[in-house]
């Protein structure tokens, strides 16, 4: 989860988020090098007294500054496309959970079970227990097994919402009348917090998401107790 005064991204807890962090660092380094070069050239232009006004064209220079940016763009595009295809690939999920957005709460249905569904509302600040997080705690957490592929089917019953959990690298729009899907797999147990990331009305800020990733045996006990 995020912390006060945090400058970087949240710690990765899924293979996709790890790839996104690597891509972020890769792209940031390219941008840093280009920015440094541009600032260096600008400083030279402002400080040097040398001028060369007789040059009308320079084919070699024009060729270089056409090819070099194209190569840089390819260096950014190829890793990005690789991650996009990884995020879009869904192979034999172990569990499917249907998520519906409402104004202003989430409802979840475990479609592999006959009658396992619930609504998830934010806990008001006045009802929080010591140690609980303001605007992030819910009355019903989404319990999922760790180290297993989980497919999330996401839609909405009223307006546009967006189901997002940053530490897992997840952000999928919930569109009325449309069923979007994404996958998640956590490499370690824990609580992972997210929020609705699409402005959806006056209580948009009060639609938290809490995922509780647990070992499979604990998930089986929880699902049995909910049925």
From Swiss-Prot:
Keyword terms: Copper, Electron transport, Magnesium, Membrane, Metal-binding, Mitochondrion, Mitochondrion inner membrane, Respiratory chain, Translocase, Transmembrane, Transmembrane helix, Transport
Transmembrane segments: 15-45, 60-87
Stored InterPro entries: CcO_II, CcO_II-like_C, CcO_II_C, Copper_CuA, Cupredoxin, Cyt_c_oxidase_su2, Cyt_c_oxidase_su2_TM_dom, Cyt_c_oxidase_su2_TM_sf
Record CDD domains: CcO_II_C
Binding of Cu cation A2, residues: 196, 198, 200, 204
Positions annotated to bind Mg(2+): 198
Record topology, Mitochondrial intermembrane segments: 1-14, 88-227
Membrane topology, Mitochondrial matrix segments: 46-59
Pfam families reported for this sequence: COX2, COX2_TM
PANTHER family registered for this protein in UniProt: CYTOCHROME C OXIDASE SUBUNIT 2 (PTHR22888:SF9), CYTOCHROME C OXIDASE, SUBUNIT II (PTHR22888)
UniProt protein name: Cytochrome c oxidase subunit 2
Classification of source organism: Eukaryota, Metazoa, Chordata, Craniata, Vertebrata
């Amino acid at each position: 989860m995020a912390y006060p005064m945090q400058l970087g991204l949240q710690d990765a807890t899924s293979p996709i988020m790890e790839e996104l962090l690597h891509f972020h660092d890769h792209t940031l380094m390219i941008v840093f090098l280009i920015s440094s070069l541009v600032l260096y050239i600008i400083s030279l232009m402002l400080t040097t007294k040398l001028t060369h006004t007789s040059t009308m064209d320079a084919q070699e220079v024009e060729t270089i500054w056409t090819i070099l940016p194209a190569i840089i763009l390819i260096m950014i595009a190829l890793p990005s496309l690789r991650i996009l295809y990884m995020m879009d690939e869904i192979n034999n999920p172990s569990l499917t959970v249907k998520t519906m957005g409402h104004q202003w709460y989430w409802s979840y249905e475990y479609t592999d079970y006959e009658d396992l569904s619930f609504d998830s509302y934010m806990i008001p600040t006045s009802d929080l227990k010591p140690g609980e997080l303001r605007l992030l705690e819910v009355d019903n957490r989404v319990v999922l097994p760790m180290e297993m592929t989980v497919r999330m089917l996401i839609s909405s019953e009223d307006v546009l919402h967006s189901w997002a959990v940053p530490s897992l690298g997840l952000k999928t729009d919930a569109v009325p009348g449309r069923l979007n899907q994404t996958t998640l797999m956590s490499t370690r147990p824990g609580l992972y917090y997210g929020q609705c990331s699409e402005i959806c009305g006056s209580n948009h800020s009060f639609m938290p998401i809490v995922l509780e990733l647990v070992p499979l045996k604990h998930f089986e006990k929880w699902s049995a107790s909910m049925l």
